[in-house]
UniProtKB/Swiss-Prot annotation:
EC nos: 2.3.2.27
Keywords: Apoptosis, Cytoplasm, Isopeptide bond, Metal-binding, Nucleus, Phosphoprotein, Repeat, S-nitrosylation, Transferase, Ubl conjugation, Ubl conjugation pathway, Wnt signaling pathway, Zinc, Zinc-finger
Residues bearing the modification S-nitrosocysteine: C449
CDD domains in the cross-refs: BIR, RING-HC_BIRC4_8, UBA_BIRC4_8
Protein name in the entry: E3 ubiquitin-protein ligase XIAP
Gene designation per UniProt: Xiap
Post-translational modification: S-Nitrosylation down-regulates its E3 ubiquitin-protein ligase activity.
Protein family per UniProt: Belongs to the IAP family.
Organism: Rattus norvegicus (Rat)
Length: 496
C-alpha cells in the first residue's frame, strides 16, 4: 500500500457544523460524488463509507466530521487507513456516531476501526481471509471490499505452500476459466472450488472473474502488493517431518547437474576467446558456461541452456525468466528478484527469445505459448495451434508487441486463413479466367452475413469456430448454420 502523509493529505478549515450533521448519513455523502473521476483507483462508495465527501476538485475528498482532506489516491490505498493516519482523533473514525445511535448504512468493517476497507480495482473482486465468519467474507467478496488484518500469521494456509499441492486443487477447474492451473499455482494461488475463484496460500487474498488478458502474477501483485509471497519473503513452513517445504519450480534440484562447473573459475575458462555481444564474466557469474557452439551456454546447476544473445540482455534476467526454479539462481538473487522478473516481462518477450534449439527447450517455448489463455480460447474455437503460434510470432516481428485482446488475435487468424485460401485458389482462378469484378464480388460476399446477406460477419461460434453471421443474426440462433453444432459461446471479432 502506498501512502504519502505529506503530499496527499491536508487539513481544511472546518465547515458549518449544522451542515455536517446532514452527512452523518452515508447516502448523503455518496450523493456528493456525482462528478467524481471514474478513473480513480479508489471508488466513490468506498470513500463515502470512510466518511468522505467529494470537494469537486480532482480526486480530493474531505471528511464531514474532522474536515481533513485527502487526494492523490493510488492503487492499494485504504480509505479508512489514510483517514486514520491524518486524523487519528476523528470522531467518525473513532465510532462517535455509532455510539450515539446515528444510522449508518455501512458494512461492519468501519465500526470502531475493526477492519480496514479498500476498494475493488477493475473488474476483480478480492479480499483477504481470516474473517469472523464466512458469511461476512462472502459479503465482502460480493461488494468488492478488501479486509486486511496485518497482525496475522503467514502463510495463511501452510498446506498449500507447495506448488504441487496447489495444482492438485484444480481438478474441477471450470472449462470457461481463462487462466491455466499451472500459471495460477505458480503465482501462489489454489482453487477454492467456487466458480473461477482462487486464493493465495500466503496472504489469503482471493481473486475471481478472470479475463482473457489477465496474468496471474500481475493480478496477484496489483491487488495484494504487500503479500509476502509476492514480495519474495521467506514464507516456507516446516512439514510434519521437519523438512522445510520450498516453493516448487520446474528444473529445481538441490544438486547441480554439472558439479565440475560449480566454481566461477571453471566456468570462465570455457569461454576462451568469446567474441559475442554479451559479457562472458556476467554469464559466468550467472552460472553459465560455454558449450563451444556459437553463443550457446548452459547453467551448471539446473542445466538450462540459452543462445542467440542480444547486446541488451542481462544473463541473470534471462536465467530467471527461463529457469526460475534454479537453486543457484534462487540462492544468489533471491525469490523477490525472480518474482519481479516474471511480473515485468510479458509473454511476448519470451516468445521472440530464441532459447537453445534443443527439443526440450523448443517444447518449453511451445508450452509457454500454449498456456496463454488467449491461445487456449482460440484453440477452443477450432483454430490450429501452429497457425496461432505463427500469427503471434508475425505480430511480434512486425510490431514488437504481443496481442492484448482475443478479438484482435481472432481477426488476424481469420484474415490469415483467408489469405492462405486465396493463395491456394489463385492458380485455379487464373485458369478459369475469372474477371476482376467477379473476384471482388465474391470477396464482398464472403464478408456478408450468410443469414441476412446485408451486414458484415462479426461473430465466431464456439466450439465449431465457424464465422458466418453478423451480431444481430447471431443472437437469434442456438446452433451453427454451417454444421448444426450447438453453440456454447459467441465471440465478437472485428474484421479489417
Amino acid at each position: 500500500m502506498t501512502f504519502n502523509s505529506f503530499e496527499g493529505s491536508r487539513t481544511v478549515v472546518p465547515a458549518d457544523t449544522n451542515k455536517d450533521e446532514e452527512f452523518v448519513e452515508e447516502f448523503n455523502r455518496l450523493k456528493t460524488f456525482a462528478n467524481f473521476p471514474s478513473s480513480s483507483p479508489v471508488s466513490a462508495s468506498t470513500l463515502a463509507r470512510a466518511g468522505f465527501l467529494y470537494t469537486g476538485e480532482g480526486d480530493t475528498v474531505q471528511c464531514f466530521s474532522c474536515h481533513a482532506a485527502v487526494d492523490r489516491w493510488q492503487y492499494g490505498d485504504s480509505a479508512v487507513g489514510r483517514h486514520r493516519r491524518i486524523s487519528p482523533n476523528c470522531r467518525f473514525i473513532n465510532g462517535f456516531y455509532f455510539e450515539n445511535g446515528a444510522t449508518q448504512s455501512t458494512s461492519p468493517g468501519i465500526q470502531n476501526g475493526q477492519y480496514k476497507s479498500e476498494n475493488c480495482v477493475g473488474n476483480r473482486n478480492h479480499f483477504a481471509l481470516d474473517r469472523p465468519s464466512e458469511t461476512h467474507a462472502d459479503y465482502l467478496l460480493r461488494t468488492g471490499q478488501v479486509v486486511d488484518i496485518s497482525d496475522t500469521i503467514y502463510p495463511r494456509n501452510p498446506a498449500m505452500c507447495s506448488e504441487e499441492a496447489r495444482l492438485k486443487t484444480f481438478q474441477n477447474w471450470p472449462d470457461y476459466a481463462h487462466l491455466s492451473p499451472r500459471e495460477l499455482a505458480s503465482a501462489g494461488l489454489y482453487y477454492t472450488g467456487i466458480d473461477d475463484q482462487v486464493q493465495c496460500f500466503c496472504c489469503g487474498g482471493k481473486l475471481k472473474n478472470w479475463e482473457p488478458c489477465d496474468r496471474a502474477w500481475s493480478e496477484h501483485r496489483r491487488h495484494f502488493p504487500n503479500c509476502f509471497f509476492v514480495l519474495g519473503r521467506n514464507v516456507n513452513v516446516r512439514s510434519e517431518s521437519g523438512v522445510s517445504s520450498d516453493r516448487n519450480f520446474p528444473n529445481s534440484t538441490n544438486s547441480p547437474r554439472n558439479p565440475a562447473m560449480a566454481e566461477y573459475d571453471a566456468r570462465i575458462v570455457t569461454f576462451g576467446t568469446w567474441l559475442y555481444s554479451v559479457n562472458k564474466e556476467q554469464l559466468a557469474r550467472a552460472g553459465f558456461y560455454a558449450l563451444g557452439e556459437g553463443d550457446k551456454v548452459k547453467c551448471f546447476h539446473c542445466g538450462g541452456g540459452l543462445t542467440d544473445w542480444k547486446p541488451s540482455e542481462d544473463p541473470w534476467e534471462q536465467h530467471a525468466k527461463w529457469y526460475p526454479g534454479c537453486k543457484y539462481l534462487l540462492d544468489e538473487k533471491g525469490q523477490e528478484y525472480i518474482n519481479n522478473i516474471h511480473l515485468t516481462h510479458s509473454l511476448g518477450e519470451s516468445v521472440v527469445r530464441t532459447a537453445e534449439k534443443t527439443p526440450s527447450v523448443t517444447k518449453k517455448i511451445d508450452d509457454t505459448i500454449f498456456q496463454n489463455p488467449m491461445v487456449q480460447e482460440a484453440i477452443r474455437m477450432g483454430f490450429n495451434f501452429k497457425d496461432i503460434k505463427k500469427t503471434m510470432e508475425e505480430k511480434l516481428q512486425t510490431s514488437g508487441s504481443n496481442y492484448l485482446s482475443l478479438e484482435v488475435l481472432i481477426a488476424d487468424l481469420v484474415s490469415a486463413q483467408k489469405d492462405n485460401s486465396q493463395d491456394e485458389s489463385s492458380q485455379t482462378s487464373l485458369q478459369k479466367d475469372i474477371s476482376t469484378e467477379e473476384q471482388l464480388r465474391r470477396l464482398q460476399e464472403e464478408k456478408l452475413c450468410k443469414i441476412c446477406m446485408d451486414r458484415n460477419i462479426a461473430i465466431v461460434f464456439v466450439p465449431c469456430g465457424h464465422l458466418v453471421t453478423c451480431k444481430q443474426c447471431a443472437e437469434a440462433v442456438d446452433k451453427c448454420p454451417m454444421c448444426c453444432t450447438v453453440i456454447t459461446f459467441k465471440q465478437k471479432i472485428f474484421m479489417s
